[in-house]
Curated annotation (Swiss-Prot):
This is Large ribosomal subunit protein bL20. Keywords: Ribonucleoprotein, Ribosomal protein, RNA-binding, rRNA-binding. Binds directly to 23S ribosomal RNA and is necessary for the in vitro assembly process of the 50S ribosomal subunit. It is not involved in the protein synthesizing functions of that subunit. It holds the Pfam family Ribosomal_L20. It comes from the Bacteria. GO terms for molecular function: rRNA binding; structural constituent of ribosome.
């Protein structure tokens, strides 16, 4: 039986890793070993940051809502509590969008929250 050296398979594996490392800085897109390490790290960062992105956007929305709420004489927590008492269910993403793009609608919601809080 003939000896199989596996050159084709090895080259394909290395080529696949180097293709994934395209655009990386320095040796990380040229040398197989460093490229492989960087690709593995990249997968880790991608997995981690897909979850982090959700947290980051929620923080951004809360910051925007808080800024708009303070313009209407309420804190973020007072606004959210007032909206809950008024039985107005608007998620933070939509509230932040209203705060940025439709100040009049946000003010109407803030006034409804104030009324329920007794302010």
């Amino acid at each position: 039986m003939a000896r199989v050296k596996g050159g084709v398979v090895s080259r394909k594996r290395r080529k696949r890793v180097l293709k994934l490392a395209k655009g990386y800085y320095g040796a990380k897109h040229i040398l197989f070993r460093t490229a492989k390490e960087q690709v593995m790290n990249s997968y880790y960062y991608a997995y981690r940051d897909r979850r982090q992105k959700k947290r980051d956007f929620r923080k951004l929305w809360i910051t925007r809502i808080n800024a708009a709420a303070r313009m209407n004489g309420l804190s973020y927590s007072q606004l959210m509590h007032g909206l809950k008492l008024a039985e107005i269910e608007v998620n933070r993403k939509m509230l932040a969008d209203l705060a940025v793009n439709d100040a009049a609608a946000f003010t109407a919601l803030a006034d409804a929250a104030k009324a329920k809080l007794g302010k």
